[in-house]
Amino acid sequence: MSPREIEVSEPREVGITELVLRDAHQSLMATRMAMEDMVGACADIDAAGYWSVECWGGATYDSCIRFLNEDPWERLRTFRKLMPNSRLQMLLRGQNLLGYRHYNDEVVDRFVDKSAENGMDVFRVFDAMNDPRNMAHAMAAVKKAGKHAQGTICYTISPVHTVEGYVKLAGQLLDMGADSIALKDMAALLKPQPAYDIIKAIKDTYGQKTQINLHCHSTTGVTEVSLMKAIEAGVDVVDTAISSMSLGPGHNPTESVAEMLEGTGYTTNLDYDRLHKIRDHFKAIRPKYKKFESKTLVDTSIFKSQIPGGMLSNMESQLRAQGAEDKMDEVMAEVPRVRKAAGFPPLVTPSSQIVGTQAVFNVMMGEYKRMTGEFADIMLGYYGASPADRDPKVVKLAEEQSGKKPITQRPADLLPPEWEKQSKEAATLKGFNGTDEDVLTYALFPQVAPVFFEHRAEGPHSVALTDAQLKAEAEGDEKSLAVAGPVTYNVNVGGTVREVTVQQA
C-alpha cells in the first residue's frame, strides 16, 4: 500500500456537557448567580456545539426562591427560549426531587411532567444511597414524558465499593429503561485507573453502544487525567465548565479538555470562538460574586478523609456555633466511623450532611448518646438500602431513640398521598398563582415558598456586587496601595522640624 492509500480514520467525537449555568456556580459561589448574569452568554452556549447544557436542578431551585427572589420555573422557561437548539439538562435527586425528603409518587410524576413541559430534555437521576428503587419511579416518569432518562451512579470509595458493584448498578439502571448512564464523581475521588476500569467494564458488559456520561469535580487536581483515561475507555460524554468558571471545588475547564484531545484521535468539535466569548462573559461577571467564592483550590486530603468540601464547611460551622472549633480533628476522625456504621453510603447530599452532623454530635455528646432524626432514618432504612450492612448495635439505638422500626421496602411506598393536601395549603398563601408549578414549589420548600410567593412581584433580588460597589472597592484598593510603601512625615519636635520615614508593617 502506497502512502497515499493509507486510510486515516476520523477522530471519535466526545460530547461535552457544559456546567457553567448550574453546577459550576453551585460549586464555586454557593449557587448565587442571578439569571441576569447568565442570559448574555446563552446565544453563544446554544451555538457552541455542546452535547447538553446543564442549567437547572441541584441546589438552584432552592437558591432561586430562598436568596434571589427568582421563580425557578421562569428561569427554566427563559433558558428554553434563549437556547432553542440545545439539550437542556438537570440534576434530579430521584424520589427526593429537588428537596430534602422523599415525596409521594404523584408529586414525582407532577414534577417531572412540569419540568418536561417547561423545556427540560435530559434528566440526570441519582440517589444519595445508590439505591435503584429510589430512582425507578422518577426515571419511569421521564420516559413517560418522552424525555432522556439518565440513570446515575454516585462514585465513592470504601471497602464494599468495587468495579463489579458499579457494573451491576449500571445494569439495574439500564433494565429500568435508562437512555444513558452517568458516573458522578461529586468529591473528585475518581483517579485515572478506576475511571478507565469502570467505563471499560460497563461497555464490555452491556455493549459499546451503551452511552456513558462522566461527571467529575476538580478539587483533588487529578481528574482531568481521569477524563482522558475514561475517554480512552470509551466514555461518550464528559462534563466540563468554561475556564473562567472552573477548577477548585468546581470542574475541569471546557477549553482545556477540548485542547487536550487535539491530535489524539478524539475531538469535541466545539466552536472555539464561541467558547472564548462564553469565557469572557463569565470572566467579567465573576468578581461580582467574590464574597461567595470558595477558598478551596486543590485538596488531596479528601482521598483520605472522603469528606467533600461542602460537608467540611458544614461541620466547621456547626462546631463554630458551639465554640468548639478545636474539636475539628476529632470530628474528622469520627466521620469514617459513622459512615461505616451506616453501611458506607456515598457522601453526597443529603447523606453527607447527615453523616457529618452525627459525627459532630458523637464528639460533643458521646457516641450515639443523641442521634439526629435523619441519621436514625438512615440507620432504619427510611432513606433506602445502604451499600453494606449497617451496624446492628447502632440500628438498635436508632430504634430506641426514634421509636421507629427498621424497614426494607422502598421508602416511598410508605408515604400517603399528598398532592391534594399540598394544593389546598398552597392555595391559601398570599401571592400563589394557581399553577401546578407553584404547588410544587410549596411541596418542596414549605417554609420558604410562602415568603417567596408574597414577594415574587418585587422581581429578582441579586446578591451580587454592583458595578458601583466594585469600582469603589477597586478605588479603595488603589488608595491602600498608595500607602503600602515607606511614608515620610515632617514632625515638629520642640520647634525643630525633623523628617521621619515610617516603613509599613
UniProtKB/Swiss-Prot annotation:
Changing K184 to A/E: Loss of activity. Changing A59T: Decreases activity by 96%. One of its GO terms (biological process) is gluconeogenesis. One of its GO terms (molecular function) is metal ion binding. The lineage of its organism: Bacteria, Bacillati, Actinomycetota, Actinomycetes, Propionibacteriales. Keywords: Cobalt, Metal-binding, Transferase. It comes from the Bacteria. Co(2+) binds at D23, K184, H215, H217. Residues 14-276 form the Pyruvate carboxyltransferase domain. Substrate binds at R22, D23, A24, H25, Q26, A59, K184. This is Methylmalonyl-CoA carboxyltransferase 5S subunit. Signal peptide: none annotated. Lys-184 is carboxylated in the free enzyme and helps to coordinate the cobalt ion. Lys-184 is partially carboxylated in the complex with pyruvate, but is not carboxylated in the oxaloacetate-bound form. It comes from Propionibacterium freudenreichii subsp. shermanii. The keyword Metal-binding applies. One of its GO terms (cellular component) is cytoplasm. Pfam families: HMGL-like (PF00682), PYC_OADA (PF02436). Disulfide bonds: none annotated.
